[in-house]
Amino acid sequence: MNLDQLEVSHDADSLCVVIEISKHSNIKYELDKESGALMVDRVLYGAQNYPANYGFVPNTLGSDGDPVDALVLSDVAFQAGSVVKARLVGVLNMEDESGMDEKLLALPIDKIDPTHSYVKDIDDLSKHTLDKIKHFFETYKDLEPNKWVKVKGFENKESAIKVLEKAIKAYQG
C-alpha cells in the first residue's frame, strides 16, 4: 500500500482510517512505512482479542511519534489493510512504557455501516462498550516483560478533533 497515493480525508465526519488489526484478532500487525507491507509485530501474550478494528489515520503524527491510532467500532471485522471512512466520536487517553498515547474512537460512516448511526459522541456509546475497550488496553500487555499501560480515561468528540488537529499539524511540521 502506497499511502502517498491515497486521497486522505482528515474531516472528523469522514476520516480515512487504515485498518492494521481486525476486530477480534489476537495478532498485532503494523504497516511498514517503507514497503507498505503489513508486518506481524507479535501475537498478544494474553488471552485477549482486540475489541474493535484498530489502525491509524494517515498523514498524522501522534504524541508517540507514530501516526495517530484509531479504533473503528463496528459489529463487523474489517480486513487488515483496508481503508475505512469513519467519523470521530471520542478519544481514549492512555500512557504506556513509551509515553502518552491517544486512541481516536470512530464509527464507520453511515454509507458503509449505518448500524450505529445514532452515535454522535462518546456519551452515546454504551458503558459496556467503553468498559470493554478500557479493560482491553489496561490488560493486553500484562504478560509482556517491561511493558505496561495506564488508561487515563475517555473524552468526547470535541477533544478527539483537537487530538486529530494537533496530529495533522505535527505531521506537516
From Swiss-Prot:
PROSITE patterns: PPASE (PS00387). Substrate binds at residues 28, 42, 54, 140. One of its GO terms (molecular function) is magnesium ion binding. Signal peptide: none annotated. It holds the Pfam family Pyrophosphatase. GO terms for biological process: phosphate-containing compound metabolic process. Mg(2+) 2 binds at residue 69. Keywords: Cytoplasm, Hydrolase, Magnesium, Metal-binding. It comes from the Bacteria. Its cofactor is Mg(2+). It catalyses: diphosphate + H2O = 2 phosphate + H(+). Its EC number is 3.6.1.1. Mg(2+) 1 binds at residues 64, 69, 101. One of its GO terms (cellular component) is cytoplasm. It is found in: Cytoplasm. NCBIfam families: PRK01250.1 (NF002317). Homohexamer. Belongs to the PPase family. Catalyzes the hydrolysis of inorganic pyrophosphate (PPi) forming two phosphate ions. This is Inorganic pyrophosphatase. It comes from Helicobacter pylori (strain J99 / ATCC 700824). The gene is ppa.
